[in-house]
């Protein structure tokens, strides 16, 4: 028994052709009486401050049912960092920093950056810093045995079977020895240690009185700053006019006078001659600070009574300047004490002679 099926024929859809029909169809589609149509509104009725917190949230946990957010949730992909830290470390020669547990200052040290060719060595007293690599177990050992200068520093660099050892001391010589049987190379390089330490080891806390004379204000301030580093408790008088020096020296007792040579009206040589002409000022130290440092000038300064001459600019080590000034002041004070003691002894001897003469006459 055959069953006949009737083919379905769709009725053609009539499109509106006139504007009135278009308006009528639009009103029917937007009428609330049609339950089959679902209205979706993409507009959010709120101000900017109410929507701003929602924008800062994660789309996966947002309670809004925006169509754009749903599309982002469906199309979102997780980004994975494909970089391997092992490969990155191998690229940079597997250099890692390891401060030994025996280092008492390990807690106070930060992780330092080392170059694989020329490591930055940290010099500390009585402790060691070790740089190790996990692949070859190579170590960079830097040890200092004495903090005093000149010091002997040993740098030992080990990479597997080969060893490079460098020793620095105060002499200049080079020696190299190679052993092919053990594949070990030892190279000793000895160079002269340079001393460029311009720091002061210990300032002098004596309350000295200094007089500075210079017609250049900048040079005067530079010398004043240096002397304050050497003698923090010193009383320093600065004078630009050299004609006032005579009165200041007569009315005050200074331990040292620092004078410039080339000055108008009264130069440094005339000031030194005036000071040395007074016997009571023999304990006063006179030091010249000038650019004139030829042999003839130095001979003239010594003949005039200037104790020492510092050349400009003052590129001397602070310890050197302090030692020179202290030595001259002590020598001048010692000579004055000897003169006073000798004068007292001569007076006592004269009194004793007079007393003996009176006794003999009696």
From Swiss-Prot:
Region (Disordered): 1-39, 163-188
Record keywords, A-Z: Phosphoprotein
Family matches, as InterPro entries: 2C_system_His_kinase, CheY-like_superfamily, Sig_transdc_resp-reg_receiver
Residue span(s) of domain Response regulatory: 209-327
Residue positions where 4-aspartylphosphate is found in the record: 260
One Gene Ontology biological process: filamentous growth of a population of unicellular organisms in response to biotic stimulus
Biased composition (Low complexity): 19-39
Function: Required for stress adaptation, morphogenesis and virulence.
Name of the featured protein: Stress response regulator protein 1
Species in which this protein is naturally found: Lodderomyces elongisporus (strain ATCC 11503 / CBS 2605 / JCM 1781 / NBRC 1676 / NRRL YB-4239)
Phylogenetic placement of the source organism: Eukaryota, Fungi, Dikarya, Ascomycota, Saccharomycotina
Gene: SRR1
């Amino acid at each position: 028994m055959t069953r006949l099926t009737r083919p379905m024929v769709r009725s053609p859809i009539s499109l509106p052709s006139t504007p009135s029909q278009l308006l009528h169809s639009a009103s029917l589609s937007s009428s609330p009486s049609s339950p089959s149509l679902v209205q979706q509104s993409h507009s959010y009725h709120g101000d900017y401050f109410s929507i701003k917190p929602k924008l800062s949230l994660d789309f996966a946990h947002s309670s809004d049912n925006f169509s754009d957010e749903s599309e982002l949730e469906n199309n979102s992909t997780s980004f994975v960092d494909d970089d391997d830290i092992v490969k990155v470390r191998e690229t940079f020669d597997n250099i890692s920093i390891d401060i030994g547990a025996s280092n008492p200052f390990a807690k106070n040290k930060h992780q330092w950056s080392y170059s694989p060719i020329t490591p930055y060595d940290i010099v500390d007293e009585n402790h060691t810093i070790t740089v190790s690599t996990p692949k070859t177990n190579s170590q960079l050992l830097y040890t200092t045995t004495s903090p005093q200068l000149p010091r002997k520093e040993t740098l030992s660099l080990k990479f597997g079977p080969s060893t490079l050892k460098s020793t620095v001391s105060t002499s200049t010589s080079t020696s190299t020895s190679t052993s092919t049987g053990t594949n070990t190379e030892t190279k000793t390089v000895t160079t002269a240690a340079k001393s460029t330490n311009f720091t002061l080891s210990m300032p002098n806390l004596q309350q000295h009185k200094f007089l500075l004379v210079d017609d250049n204000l900048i040079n005067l301030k530079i010398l004043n700053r240096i002397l304050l580093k050497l003698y923090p408790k010193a009383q320093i008088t600065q004078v630009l006019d050299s004609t006032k020096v005579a009165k200041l020296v007569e009315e005050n007792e200074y331990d040292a006078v620092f004078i410039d040579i080339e000055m108008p009206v009264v130069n440094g040589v005339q000031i030194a001659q005036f000071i040395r002409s007074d016997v009571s000022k023999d304990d006063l130290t006179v030091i010249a600070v000038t650019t004139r440092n030829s042999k003839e000038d130095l001979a003239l300064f010594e003949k005039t009574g200037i104790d020492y001459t510092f050349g400009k600019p003052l590129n001397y080590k602070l310890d050197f300047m302090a030692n020179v000034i202290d030595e001259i002041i002590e020598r001048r004070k010692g000579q004055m004490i000897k003169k006073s003691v000798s004068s007292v002894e001569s007076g006592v001897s004269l009194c004793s002679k007079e007393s003996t003469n009176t006794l003999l006459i009696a």
